[in-house]
Swiss-Prot record:
Keyword tags: Cell inner membrane, Cell membrane, Membrane, Transferase, Transmembrane, Transmembrane helix
GO biological process: lipoprotein biosynthetic process
Pfam family name, one: LGT
Function description: Catalyzes the transfer of the diacylglyceryl group from phosphatidylglycerol to the sulfhydryl group of the N-terminal cysteine of a prolipoprotein, the first step in the formation of mature lipoproteins.
Places the protein is found: Cell inner membrane
Protein source organism: Rickettsia felis (strain ATCC VR-1525 / URRWXCal2) (Rickettsia azadi)
Pathway: Protein modification; lipoprotein biosynthesis (diacylglyceryl transfer)
Top-level taxon: Bacteria
Enzyme class (EC, first level): transferase
Name this protein carries in UniProt: Phosphatidylglycerol--prolipoprotein diacylglyceryl transferase
One Gene Ontology term, aspect cellular component: plasma membrane
Family: Belongs to the Lgt family.
TM helices/strands, residue ranges: 9-29, 55-75, 92-112, 117-137, 172-192, 201-221, 228-248
Assigned EC number: 2.5.1.145
Amino acid sequence: MTFPNINPIIFSIGPLAVSWYSLSYVVGILLGWFYANKIIEKFKPQITKKNLEDFITYAVIGIIVGGRLGFVLLYNPSRYFSNPIDILKTYEGGMSFHGGALGVIIAAYLFCRKYKINFLSLTDIIAPVVPIGLFLGRIANFINGELYGRITNSSFGMIFPNSDLMPRHPSQLYEAFFEGLVLFCILAYATFKHKTLKKYGLNSGIFLIFYALFRIAIEIFREPDIQIGFILDSLTMGQILSVPMLLLGSYLICQSNPK
């Protein structure tokens, strides 16, 4: 397969450059906000549209700060400790989903404590929305030619411009499909068909379990981060960080209570 060599920069005006990567965050947040509002309109949960509007600022800060610090601390601490100013260069890429997820969880906790809202009631609204951002983010990773997969002889192999010119799995597209499209459909089906919002924590648990399973499986095709490599000979950082999500998701489903 031929890699579609797309310019990572959409357009630039003087020193200001707009990239597909940054656009994926903006569009993901806007589409997520729209979709969450539709869910609130239909099911009338404890969370109101006004609550959601107020939470957006918390969520954006949680995503950016958590995602960036997660990448810095978990994937490449030596580089950023040597050059702390590089931490601010988010336009170069380098965001961790697990860090971003933790950032949003902390933001949601602080928001719920301030406004006296049930924490799981908020995360159950967030869960069906997240796959939208995951899909767009992985497509942006693909356009950037980063986070590509392992070497393969299969017909799916692509030669990425920033790699060693060996055909590799387009693992970004695998993640976009499973963690984005498939997970979105699973949660939409659960939310609208099985009315999972009637039980605190059920949507959150479903998201955590399926994301973790998809991530663990797709990491088999994804090249480990060069600065980390394999852990315990065969595991990747993404797989290890997904195990707590799997356990927490199982707990939330088992403990989910009717509202």
